[in-house]
From Swiss-Prot:
The gene is rpsT. Belongs to the bacterial ribosomal protein bS20 family. Pfam families: Ribosomal_S20p (PF01649). One of its GO terms (cellular component) is cytosol. Binds directly to 16S ribosomal RNA. SUPFAM superfamilies: Ribosomal protein S20. Transmembrane segments: none annotated. This is Small ribosomal subunit protein bS20. One of its GO terms (biological process) is translation. InterPro entries: Ribosomal_bS20, Ribosomal_bS20_sf.
Amino acid sequence: MPLHKSAEKRLRQSERRNARNRARKKELKTLIKNMQKLIEARAAKSEVESAYRSAVQKLDRLGVKSYIHANKASRKKSQLTRLFNGYAEAE
C-alpha cells in the first residue's frame, strides 16, 4: 500500500485509467466478434460492411491514441479486411 499521499492519488488515478483502458479494449473485441458472428451467420453484405467499418474505425482511434500499439491496430485492420473481402467475394 502507498505510504505517501501522492502515491495514494497515483494509485487511484491508475485504477481509473486501467478500468477505462480495459473498457475500450473490451468494446473493440466486441465489435470484432460481432463482425465475425455476422459472417458466420451469412448475414447481408450491408450489415457485415457496417460492422467492419465500425471495427476499423475503433481500431484506428485506439491505435492513434496509443491504447493499443499502432502495429497491432494495423495488423488487426489487415486481418479484418481480408476477412471482409473474402466474404464479399463469396457473397
